[in-house]
């Protein structure tokens, strides 16, 4: 019933697909639902997009581009090998994180655009570009601890989109609340 309702909404509003952006881990009940929904959407000429933890054969898989380790090129190549290039879509999450070093978990403290700006001004640190991560970074020391800050700009997001396109990945998602302040730069590129 729910799948038919979703399909009806897609038809009524001429949506080309559905993004199933669930929070949390992959629960048992969601995978059969997503398989059924994906099959129905495919039959109607539409696509289903799911986060990687919910990957089902009937859906395109969202690959997060906000990395703190490895390389984005490798990540996209691995995803293409695993799912097929045509099933990979980019989830261009805007990265802004402060990592206290050493950081074995790969998880930092998320920063709002205002916090990032204030931290950059306070530190006066030089900003560099990481080709491996397609992100900007700077480092600073506070209270005797080394910090490494990774962050995205319109330019780094365009770099991630370009890298995906070069690999045949034509679909990407940018969430409006994360990039609303960057839209003029993103759209006028």
Q: What positions do the PLM features span?
A:
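Glycan-binding loop/region signatures in secreted carbohydrate-active enzymes
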Residues: 87-160
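Substrate-binding surface in catalytic domains of secreted glycosidases
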Residues: 27-120
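Active-site groove signature of glycoside hydrolases
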Residues: 5-32, 54-55, 62, 173
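Short, acidic/polar
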Residues: 1-12, 72-75, 152-166
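Conserved, mostly hydrophobic/aromatic
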Residues: 20, 88-90, 164
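Acidic/aromatic/glycine-rich contiguous surface patches that form carbohydrate-binding/processing clefts
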Residues: 160-189
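Short acidic, glycine/proline-enriched helix-loop-strand junctions
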Residues: 28-32, 37-47, 129-137, 181-189
């Amino acid at each position: 019933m729910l799948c038919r309702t979703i399909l009806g909404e897609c038809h009524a509003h001429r949506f080309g697909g559905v993004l199933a952006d669930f929070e949390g881990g992959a629960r048992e009940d969601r995978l059969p639902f997503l398989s059924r929904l994906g099959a129905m959407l495919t039959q109607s000429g539409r696509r289903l997009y799911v986060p990687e933890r919910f990957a089902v054969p009937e859906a395109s898989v969202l690959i997060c581009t906000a990395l703190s380790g490895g390389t984005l090129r490798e990540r996209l190549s691995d995803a293409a090998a695993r799912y097929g290039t045509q099933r990979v879509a980019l989830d261009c999450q805007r990265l802004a994180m402060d990592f206290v070093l050493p950081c074995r978990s790969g998880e930092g403290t998320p920063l709002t655009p205002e916090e990032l700006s204030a931290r950059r001004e306070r530190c006066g640190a030089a900003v560099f570009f990481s080709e491996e991560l397609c992100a900007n970074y700077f480092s600073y020391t506070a209270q005797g601890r080394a910090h490494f800050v990774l962050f995205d700009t319109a330019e780094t997001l365009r770099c991630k989109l370009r890298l995906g396109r070069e690999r045949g990945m034509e679909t990407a998602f940018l969430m409006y609340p994360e990039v609303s302040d960057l839209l003029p730069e993103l759209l006028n590129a």
